[in-house]
Amino acid sequence: MDGCRARRRARQAIANEQEPIVLEIIDVDFNNPEHGRQVLAMLNEYASGPMGGNTPLPEYAQRNLIPELAKRPTARALLARVDGEAAGVAIYIEGFSTFACRPLVNLHDLGVSPRFQGQGVGKHLLAALEDRARRLGCCKITLEVLEGNAVAQGLYRKQGYEGYALDEHTGRALFWQKKLAV
C-alpha cells in the first residue's frame, strides 16, 4: 500500500450513549509495526469470538499473517480506531469480475471489538470500504457471512448488500471450500 494512501484518514463522530466518540478510519500499512499489531489484535479478538470459531488464530498465523499480507499488493485493510485504540478492522482483497471485466473487492474479514459494537463502527468501515472500492473502479464488493450471524446480515442489508443470485431459477450462490494440506 503506498504511503499516500496509508496517510489518508477519515474522521467521523459516532454517537455513544455516554458521550460522542471520535472514530478514525485509516488505511493500514502492513509494514507499519503498530498497524500490524492492531490488525492482528483485532483478528485474534474476532477469531476468539463465536462468529470466528471461539479459538484464537493459530501460532503460525499470528507470526506470519502481517508479513504475508504485506507481500500481497492486492491485500488491503482498514482500521477503525478510537483515541488510538483499535475498534474494528476490515481486511479486503482486490479480485476481478470476468463477466463485468472490472475489478471487484472481496471483504475477507470484518470485525468490531465487543467494546465498540452497536456504535456504528461496522457501518463506517463498510462506508470507507465502498469509498476505496469506487476509487479502484470496482464493479462490486463481495463478502461471505455465516448463516447464523443475524447481526452482521442486518448490518450488510442496511448498507445495501444482498445474497447473490443470477436469477430465481438458478438460485442463490453458495460459498464452498476445499481445504488443502500444507
Regions found by a protein language model. Name each.
Residues V82, Y92-F99:
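A conserved beta-strand-loop-helix scaffold within acyl/acetyltransferase catalytic domains
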Residues E24, F30, M42, G137-V182:
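C-terminal "cap" of GNAT-fold acetyltransferases
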Residues V112, G118-D131, G154, K158:
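Conserved acetyl-CoA-binding loop-helix of GNAT-fold acetyltransferases
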Residues A75-A90, S113:
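Conserved beta-hairpin
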Residues C4-R8, A13-R37, A41, S48, ...:
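Conserved N-terminal entry element of GNAT/NAT acetyltransferase domains
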Residues P67-L79, N106:
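A short helix-loop-beta-strand connector motif used in the catalytic cores of GNAT acetyltransferases and
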Residues R102-P114:
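Conserved acetyl-CoA binding element of GNAT-fold acetyltransferases
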